[in-house]
Swiss-Prot record:
Chief localization: cytoplasm
Root EC class: transferase
Protein known as: tRNA-2-methylthio-N(6)-dimethylallyladenosine synthase
Annotated ranges, domain Radical SAM core: 143-375
Residues in MTTase N-terminal domain copies: 2-120
This protein's UniProt keywords: 4Fe-4S, Cytoplasm, Iron, Iron-sulfur, Metal-binding, S-adenosyl-L-methionine, Transferase, tRNA processing
SMART domains: Elp3 (SM00729)
Domain TRAM positions: 378-441
């Protein structure tokens, strides 16, 4: 049985793709063994991310560390997948000639054939094309290893924000046909999955073709998935404010399985910066979406992405971001220092803000967000939360770990038969990034 080591960088879409790589290899070889140490593997894969500069360089650092393994075992297969693969292509082979296969997100289904071609010809294989339809047509059924599962419903992005490489590495938006999505979710539900997380770089831009040739939009998809037997909770990520329609907002009113947590990236609270980013909305328009959502879901927890130090960002513009964060009360958000990505329009903009100032802004924004996270956690003490038990706690092997609808981790004392089940927990303690709870007796 082939032993496979895979390391995943970046977003949840990459996590989904890594699972699919393991699935196509398992189908090809009649099963595989996933190992946690590279030196135990027959196949080593790095599924890469190019959104941040450090993530990109980390890949080449990791490649350097596995090079001695290749020198000792020439039959070892080393592969680079994901967005760095799409962006760099043949350059990866030039920089690391011991790499055997390089493939993008849209060609992961071709991985087994690429390995065979490498072993037959002795030549490194590179395929970073964009055959979107092919990928979804050739993927095997999902492997189920828990009570929650990701389902990719669309790929790529057509928004072309000035700082972002996704349209260049994942291609234009492409939506899976509705029936394909529903079939995958129904199969997962039959295998015991209770929570579905719908994935896409711009998930709410979903426009899937139906059997009659009509188009199903994202709000309609949510309503259909809501009725699939066995599915008890629904999430989605990542959405774009430009596509956040009133019909999606109404789903939060009508669909109780849709969790009270939303990740909706805004990036900045400054209209000038948003315009320079080519985001396509103003801070006021974003706030209008949130007002509508909280009018029908007052308990909605909202997380977001922020970039500080975007070229030309002034102190006043950063203060506008701070004010927006306080006004909206964001929770559990992700803050990044701007990192210029090659080939994007923003990479050519003048940037005279010192790095030390960018770090200060990062820390200041994180401080405000973490304070709000702590406040929300405190308000949950004494409440009863419906939770999905994910497995053994990462902090204490004698405890179990569960997740609330608003995306909080809860550690509690339980029994192994509770894993992958939905249970009620009373929250007893609150920490910065987790909660402690106890089982509510029936």
């Amino acid at each position: 049985m082939k032993k496979v080591f895979i390391r995943t960088f970046g977003c949840q879409m990459n996590e989904y793709d890594s699972e699919k790589m393991l699935s196509v290899l398992a189908e090809e070889h009649g099963g595989i063994e996933q190992v946690t140490q590279a030196d135990e593997a027959d196949i080593i894969l790095f599924n890469t991310c190019s959104v941040r500069e450090k993530a990109q360089e980390k890949v080449f650092s990791d490649l350097g560390r596995v090079r001695p393994l290749k020198e000792k075992n020439p039959g070892l297969i080393i592969g680079v997948a994901g967005c760095v693969a799409s962006q760099e292509g043949e350059n990866i082979i030039k920089r690391a000639p011991y790499v055997d296969v390089v493939f993008g997100p849209q060609t992961l289904h071709r991985l087994p054939k690429m390995i065979v071609d490498k072993e037959t010809s002795g030549l490194s294989q590179v395929d970073i094309s964009f055959p979107e339809i092919e990928k979804f047509d050739h993927l095997p059924p999902a492997r189920v290893e828990g009570g929650a599962a990701f389902v990719s419903i669309m790929e790529g992005c057509s928004k072309y924000c000035s700082f972002c490489v996704v349209p260049y590495t994942r291609g234009e938006e492409f939506s899976r046909p509705l029936n394909d999505v529903l079939t995958e979710i129904a199969n997962l539900a039959q295998q015991g999955v209770k929570e579905i997380n719908l994935l896409g770089q711009n998930v709410n831009a979903y426009r899937g073709e139906m059997d009659d040739g009509e188009i199903c939009d994202f709000a309609t998809l949510l309503r259909i998935v809501h009725e699939i037997p066995g599915i008890e909770r629904m999430r989605f990520t990542t959405s774009h404010p430009r596509e956040f329609t009133d019909s999606i907002i109404e789903c939060y009113r009508d669909l109780p399985k849709l969790v009270s947590h939303l990740h909706l990236p805004i990036q900045s609270g400054s209209d000038r910066v948003l315009s320079a980013m080519k985001r396509g909305y103003t801070a006021l328009e974003y706030k209008s979406i949130i007002r509508k959502l909280r009018a029908i879901r007052p308990d909605l927890c909202l997380s977001s992405d922020f970039i500080v130090g975007f070229p030309g960002e002034t102190e006043r513009e950063f203060e506008q971001t701070l004010k927006l964060v306080k006004d909206i009360a964001f929770d559990l958000s992700f803050v990044f220092i701007y990192s210029p990505r090659p080939g994007t329009p923003a990479a050519n903009l003048p940037d005279d803000t010192p790095h030390e100032e960018k770090v200060r802004r990062l820390e200041a924004l994180n401080e405000v967000i973490e304070a709000e996270t702590a406040r929300i956690n405190q308000t949950m003490i004494g409440t009863v939360q419906r939770c999905l038990v994910e497995g053994i706690s990462k902090k204490d092997p004698d405890q179990l770990q569960a997740r609330t609808a608003n995306n909080r981790v809860v550690n509690f004392t339980g029994t192994p038969d509770m894993i992958n089940q939905m249970i009620d927990l009373e929250i007893t303690e609150a920490y910065t990034f987790s909660l402690r709870g106890k089982i509510v007796e029936a």
